[in-house]
Structures are given as C-alpha cells and as structure tokens.
C-alpha cells in the first residue's frame, strides 16, 4: 500500500479538529487546554513535513523543528506557571486564573 500526501493531510486534519474541539469543549482544565494546543501544533508539523517530503524541499522540515522547539519551551513555561499557580491558589481551574486579571 502506498501512503501519499492525502493520508498525512487527513491524519493532520483529524488531529487539528480534535485539538480545536478539546479547547472549545473543555474550558475548565488548563492542562487539557495546553495539551490541545500541543496537539494542534503537532498537526501543523505533520503538514509541514508532509508538504516538505512531497515537494522535495527541506524548508518545511526545518520549520517543523523550529516549531517543535518553540512548543517544547511553551509547554515547559506553561507547566511551570501552573505549578506556581497551584502552590499559591490550590487550584488550576480557569475561573481562578481569570481572577488574576486585576
């Protein structure tokens, strides 16, 4: 069986849709929102790599590595903020984060 670009784009679109649904359907838990954002970024990376392989160009793969680096930094900083917030407030609910707006 030959796997062409439509298979990659279908999987990527499905992952992107699941990530968007995770953000819109679950607005209570910050960790699930962060995981949904990571799923969206991963689906975008699959698109970059698929088009890069299809067009025989390395720019998409280099950009995917850049996005992975930024996503890892975003996840580390987001989880560190959540740990500090949980230590101070005792909860990581989104409603408690909205109280911090001032």
UniProtKB/Swiss-Prot annotation:
Gene Ontology terms, MF aspect: NADH:ubiquinone reductase (non-electrogenic) activity; quinone binding
Record keyword Translocase present: yes
Pfam families per record: Oxidored_q2
Topology of this chain in the membrane: Multi-pass membrane protein
Main enzyme class: translocase
Chief localisation class: membrane
Subcellular localization: Cell inner membrane
Segments traversing the membrane: 5-25, 31-51, 66-86
GO biological process: ATP synthesis coupled electron transport
Subunit structure: NDH-1 is composed of 14 different subunits. Subunits NuoA, H, J, K, L, M, N constitute the membrane sector of the complex.
Primary role: NDH-1 shuttles electrons from NADH, via FMN and iron-sulfur (Fe-S) centers, to quinones in the respiratory chain. The immediate electron acceptor for the enzyme in this species is believed to be ubiquinone. Couples the redox reaction to proton translocation (for every two electrons transferred, four hydrogen ions are translocated across the cytoplasmic membrane), and thus conserves the redox energy in a proton gradient.
Similarity comment text for this entry: Belongs to the complex I subunit 4L family.
UniProt protein name: NADH-quinone oxidoreductase subunit K
Organism: Bartonella tribocorum (strain CIP 105476 / IBS 506)
Gene name tied to this protein: nuoK
